[in-house]
Amino acid sequence: MEAIIKPQEVKVGIAEWQVLRAPGRLITLGLGSCVGIALYDSLNRMGGLAHIMLPDSSQFQDRSNRAKFADLAILDLVAALIGRGARRGRLVAKIAGGAQMFTSGDRHLSLLNIGQRNAAMVRQTLQELAIPLVAEDTGGNYGRTMIFDLESGDVLIRTIGRPLKVI
C-alpha cells in the first residue's frame, strides 16, 4: 500500500511570521485591518507569511515583538528566507487585508484608518527593498483568510459571503 503524504499546514498567528518549503501551506486567519504579506521564491519553492498589526514601529518603545510592525516584520521575514536559501532577487510579494473594519461619524477616528495605513506601509517597505508586489486583495470592510500554497505560489483568499479568490 502506498503512503499518502499530506502537505504540511502551518498557521501564522497575529503578529507572527513563518517560513516553509513546498509541499506545504502557510495560513493566517482574521485579517481585518491587519495585513498578510506572502513572500515567495519560485525556484526554491519556498516562502514566508507575516501577519502584521501596525504600520510603523517608530512610535513605540516596546518593539520586542518585531512581527507586529510592517516595517520590521518584512525585514525579518526577508532575512529568514535568505538564511534558508532563498534569493532576494527572486522574491515576489502578494498581500491581503488592510480593511476598514469599523466606521465612525467621528472625523478624527476616520483619519486613524489603520488598515489603509498598514497596506500603505507594506507597499512602501516592499518598494524600498525592491521586492515586486505582484498581487493584492486589500481594502474593503471585511475580513479575510490567506492560504499560501508553497507548491504553486498561489495565495487563496477566503472571505465569508464571497467567492474564493486566487491571487
Curated annotation (Swiss-Prot):
It holds the Pfam family CheD. The keyword Cell membrane does not apply. Its EC number is 3.5.1.44. GO terms for molecular function: protein-glutamine glutaminase activity. It comes from the Bacteria. GO terms for biological process: chemotaxis. Keywords: Chemotaxis, Hydrolase. It catalyses: L-glutaminyl-[protein] + H2O = L-glutamyl-[protein] + NH4(+). SUPFAM superfamilies: CNF1/YfiH-like putative cysteine hydrolases. InterPro entries: CheD-like_sf (IPR038592), Chemorcpt_Glu_NH3ase_CheD (IPR005659), Cytotoxic_necrot_fac-like_cat (IPR011324). CDD domains: CheD. The keyword NADP does not apply. Belongs to the CheD family. Probably deamidates glutamine residues to glutamate on methyl-accepting chemotaxis receptors (MCPs), playing an important role in chemotaxis. This is Probable chemoreceptor glutamine deamidase CheD. It comes from Moorella thermoacetica (strain ATCC 39073 / JCM 9320).
